[in-house]
C-alpha cells in the first residue's frame, strides 16, 4: 500500500509538470521590471543583490508573462554547458514579509540545470534555484537598516548578522554561484567579487499567469524528487525557508 501511495504521488507530480506549458530554457522572455509603488517594492530594489558566476550556469528567466515556463537543461557535459547566459536577459525574483519582528526580502535565481549527487541519475539535474535573504529592521527604502544576510548554502544555510562589509557593495550583497567540491553540488556563497544585476520582479508584480506557473510547476525532475528542487517563494515553502534562514 505504501508503494502504491508513493507511485500515485509521483504520477500526480508528473501531471502537474505536464499541465504547465514548457518552452526551451533560452527562449523564455524575462518579465520587464515595474515601477516600484509600495515601500516593500522600493526596499527590494534598494537592496538588490548582485551575482557573480564562478562555476556552472548563468541565471535565466524561469517563466514569462503568459505563464510559459523554462523546460530546463538536461545535465550533461561541462558545468556551464550551453547555459552561459540568455541573449534575452536574465531575471531575479523577490518576495518579502515579516519574520519574528524582522523584515525579510528573499531574492531567488533560476538556473536551467544544477549539480548534485543524485542517484541513480548521476551528478546533475534539470532546473535549480538558489536564493539570498536580506534582513531589515523595517520595510522601507529611505530609513531602513540592514541587520543580516542569509544564503542557500551547499548544505543548509549560511547566515551572518551583521553582514561583513567586504561582502557589500553599498546596499548590494555580493553573491557568487559556484561548485562546492566537498559536497559536490552547486550553491551560492558570499564573495568579494562584484557581480551582475538581473532584471528584478517582485512576487506581487508578477502577472497572475506567471505567478501561478511558478507555484504549480514541480521543478524537480528526479525520481521521487530526491534532488529536492523547489521554487522557494511558493506558499508553504516560502515561510519554511525563511524560518530556516533566520540569522538572529
From Swiss-Prot:
Factors inducing expression: Differentially expressed during the developmental and plant infection phases.
Superkingdom to which the source organism belongs: Eukaryota
InterPro entries documented for this protein: NPP1
Keyword field: Glycoprotein, Secreted, Signal, Virulence
A cellular-component GO term for this protein: extracellular region
Sugar attachment sites: 143
Residue window of motif Hepta-peptide GHRHDWE motif: 124-130
Residues making up the signal peptide according to the UniProt record: 1-19
UniProt key word Nuclease: no
Subcellular location field: Secreted
Main function: Secreted effector that contributes strongly to virulence during infection by P.capsici.
Identification of the protein by name: NLP effector protein Pc121494
Organism name: Phytophthora capsici
Amino acid at each position: 500500500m505504501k508503494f502504491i501511495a508513493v507511485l500515485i504521488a509521483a504520477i500526480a507530480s508528473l501531471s502537474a509538470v505536464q499541465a504547465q506549458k514548457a518552452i526551451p530554457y533560452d527562449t523564455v522572455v524575462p518579465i520587464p521590471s515595474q515601477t516600484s509603488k509600495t515601500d516593500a517594492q522600493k526596499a527590494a530594489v534598494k537592496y538588490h543583490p548582485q551575482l557573480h558566476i564562478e562555476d556552472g550556469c548563468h541565471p535565466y528567466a524561469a517563466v514569462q508573462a503568459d505563464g510559459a515556463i523554462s523546460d530546463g537543461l538536461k545535465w550533461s557535459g561541462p558545468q556551464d554547458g550551453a547555459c552561459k547566459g540568455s541573449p534575452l536577459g536574465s531575471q531575479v525574483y523577490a518576495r518579502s514579509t515579516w519574520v519574528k519582528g524582522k523584515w525579510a526580502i528573499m531574492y531567488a535565481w533560476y538556473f536551467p540545470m544544477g549539480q548534485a549527487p543524485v542517484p541513480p541519475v548521476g551528478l546533475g539535474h534539470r532546473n535549480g534555484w538558489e536564493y539570498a535573504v536580506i534582513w531589515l529592521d523595517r520595510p522601507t527604502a529611505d530609513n531602513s537598516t540592514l541587520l543580516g544576510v542569509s544564503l542557500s548554502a551547499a548544505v543548509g544555510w549560511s547566515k551572518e548578522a551583521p553582514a561583513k562589509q567586504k561582502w557589500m557593495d553599498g546596499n548590494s550583497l555580493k553573491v557568487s554561484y559556484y561548485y562546492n567540491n566537498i559536497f559536490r553540488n552547486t550553491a551560492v556563497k558570499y564573495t568579494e567579487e562584484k557581480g551582475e544585476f538581473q532584471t528584478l520582479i517582485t512576487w506581487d508584480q508578477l502577472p497572475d499567469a506567471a505567478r501561478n506557473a511558478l507555484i504549480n510547476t514541480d521543478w524537480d525532475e528526479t525520481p521521487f524528487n530526491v534532488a529536492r528542487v523547489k521554487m522557494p517563494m511558493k506558499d508553504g515553502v516560502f515561510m519554511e525557508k525563511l524560518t530556516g534562514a533566520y540569522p538572529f
